């Protein structure tokens, strides 16, 4: 379904919004760069090896890495906008792959308890985000920074919004377009 079609029919049910964590609300990439003593994660020589090292380090190291992520200002603005406009949302975040995935999920829940406490009870942790793209035949919305998840979401019939913390205004403008018909009901 196209965004214009969704907006044309104001009798439709409001699409549910799913909000990513890492790279949207929590500064995974800044922490990952710091862990490797580089200014930007793109300077990590072999990112696949680096993520595998974290994934197989120890449950404590994985937990501490995710629990200590700094909140991103742009993600905070998105959450604030959603709350101001009474847009229900669920956090939808992928756990770290590997043997300590559970430790990453526990850390993410604890992070949410501190930084976005109302989101914890409905948070979903899965590598298969695209399974939430539709509610029956109606599209849901995903705000994410990772192209792979956005493409899978769109291909499954959902509405994908690419978030960049440096351009939060774009994310909010896209949300305004989608949710405008539902804001003054």
Predicted regions and their residues:
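Active-site neighborhood of HAD-like aspartate-dependent phosphohydrolases
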Residues: 6-60, 155
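A short, conserved beta-to-alpha structural element at the edge of catalytic cores
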Residues: 44-53, 57, 161-182
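Short catalytic/ligand-binding loop motif for oxyanion handling, primarily in non-cytosolic enzymes
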Residues: 26-29, 34, 89-91, 98-102, ...
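Substrate-recognition element of Asp-dependent hydrolases with the DxDx(T/V) motif
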Residues: 68-70, 75-106, 112
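Acidic, Mg2+-coordinating phosphoryl-transfer loop and its flanking beta/alpha structural elements
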Residues: 140-176
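Substrate-recognition "cap/lid" segment bordering the active-site pocket of phosphatases
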Residues: 93-140, 150
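Charge-dense, intrinsically disordered terminal/linker segments
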Residues: 1-16, 24, 36, 71, ...
């Amino acid at each position: 379904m196209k965004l214009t079609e969704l907006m044309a029919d104001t009798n439709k049910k409001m699409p549910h919004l799913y909000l990513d964590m890492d790279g949207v609300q929590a500064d995974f990439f800044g922490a990952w760069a710091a862990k490797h003593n580089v200014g930007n994660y793109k300077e990590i020589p072999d990112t696949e090896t680096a993520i595998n090292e974290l994934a197989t380090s120890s449950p404590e190291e994985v937990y501490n890495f995710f629990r200590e992520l700094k909140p991103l200002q742009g993600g905070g603005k998105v959450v604030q906008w959603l709350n101001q406009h009474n847009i229900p949302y669920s956090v939808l975040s992928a756990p770290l792959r590997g043997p300590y995935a559970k430790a990453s999920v526990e850390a993410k829940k604890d992070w949410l308890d501190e930084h976005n406490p109302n989101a914890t009870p409905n948070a979903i942790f899965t590598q298969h985000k695209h399974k939430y793209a539709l509610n029956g035949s109606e599209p849901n919305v995903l705000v994410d920074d990772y192209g792979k998840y956005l493409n899978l979401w769109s291909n499954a019939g959902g509405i994908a919004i690419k978030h960049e913390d440096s351009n939060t205004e774009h994310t909010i403008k896209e949300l305004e377009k989608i949710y405008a018909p539902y804001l003054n009901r």
